Amino acid sequence: MSSNEEELRRRLRLIHLLHQTNPYPDGPGTANQRRRRRRRWRQRWQQILALADRIYSFPDPPVDTPLDLAIQQLQRLAIEELPNPPASAPEPLKDAAESP
């Protein structure tokens, strides 16, 4: 097997692993709970598809490029977590709300 075929197989295994980490939601719950689970699942699925596309289309590092640079570029590929909303309003907004 050539190195190109091995690299393609490695990328496909990685993409397959990504797909396995996000199973379709099932289980009990109210209609709203099931709907929210499906919505979150679709959002994660879209992120996985985008990540898989980037992995598949990521160019092979040139021979003269250091391996560390290629690793750093691959480490930037990640599924983003949605941030939690802030517990309180920032100071400038509090001041504006208090003085009409």
Curated annotation (Swiss-Prot):
It comes from Simian immunodeficiency virus (isolate PBj14/BCL-3) (SIV-sm). A motif (Nuclear localization signal and RNA-binding (RRE)) lies at residues 30-46. GO terms for biological process: mRNA transport. Keywords: Host cytoplasm, Host nucleus, mRNA transport, RNA-binding, Transport. The gene is rev. It is found in: Host nucleus, Host nucleolus; Host cytoplasm. Pfam families: REV. Residues 18-39, 80-100 are annotated as: Disordered. GO terms for molecular function: DNA-binding transcription factor activity; RNA binding. Escorts unspliced or incompletely spliced viral pre-mRNAs (late transcripts) out of the nucleus of infected cells. These pre-mRNAs carry a recognition sequence called Rev responsive element (RRE) located in the env gene, that is not present in fully spliced viral mRNAs (early transcripts). This function is essential since most viral proteins are translated from unspliced or partially spliced pre-mRNAs which cannot exit the nucleus by the pathway used by fully processed cellular mRNAs. Residues 14-22 are annotated as: Homomultimerization. This is Protein Rev.
